[in-house]
Amino acid sequence: MLISIDHGNKQVKTIHHAPFTSGLVCSEVRPFGGETLTYQGRYYTLTDQRIPYRRDKTEDERFFVLTLFAIAYELEAASFYGAGPVRVQLAVGLPPAHYGAQQKRFAEYFLNRGTVSFTLHDRPYEVLIDEVGCYPQSYAAAITVFQTLQSSPRALIIDIGGFTADYLLLRNGEGDLSVCDSLENGVILLYNRIKSRVAAEQDLLLDEAEIDAILLGRDSGQPDAVSQIVRHQAQEFVSDLLSSLRERMLELKSGKVIFTGGGAVLLRQQIEASDKVREPVFIEDIAANVKGYQLLYQAERIGRHNGY
């Protein structure tokens, strides 16, 4: 069974399950409540407390355990409960700037583990990960709207995530990995700036859900003064990000500029209000990367079958 997973620093995403925070609590004894997964004699519970940012996600087992959660959710969504181990093919991705150096190690992180046994919701699972396809983020998201990009001589993809903002230049629909990088300008930096400013000026402790509500125009229950601070900080954040891209000699006022990722959805109003991008285009599906991984894996498999 092919399962596509986006291992974000803020959230883990799959195609058929709601995103969940990239955070775990490990315990030697069974905790009360929560989403608890049992693996190798330990209990793992999902938490809203994110794993601290790490450039290399293979440093410990936490992202593998998050992968087991994602696999179980996808098997459950497909009502896939066969006898014996389920053979799983994973489609995953990395930021374009890290792809060349890390893609082999990231794929091997999931392989050669044999049959992996675990339980979730008291249901036992046995999976055998027998193949992993690893692809560049941003490009994967662009694949989902490929028909609109393949005729463009130049398009810039900007993927605003939790800890990083990744960019990749496309030429006639093909990714140019010589023009890509990951900037530490993800929305978590914005959250921290907003929390500090609101605490200093209004003596209030905002959480990220309240910040999201303000930026998305929903009822946050906060005073107007707080909402103004949030929106002003968000506009400054977007301005700084776009200026950083311009300093890297990336043209934002000609050609297509495609924004993707949860951060782009969150900051759409500020991006559209900026005079630094002539005509931004948004991929609003926050699961665009994970869907792109699946498409790229399937295309790669067809290519192998046809001898390419």
Feature map (PLM): residue ranges:
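Nucleotide/phosphate-binding catalytic cleft detector across ATP-hydrolyzing
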Residues: 1-155, 174-189, 209-308
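Ser/Thr-glycine-rich phosphate-binding loops at phosphate-binding pockets of nucleotides
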Residues: 160-166
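PRPP/pyrophosphate-binding module of the type I phosphoribosyltransferase fold
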Residues: 167-172
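A contiguous pocket-lining binding segment that forms or flanks enzyme active sites
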Residues: 197
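Short, basic interhelical loop/turn and adjoining N-cap
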Residues: 202-205
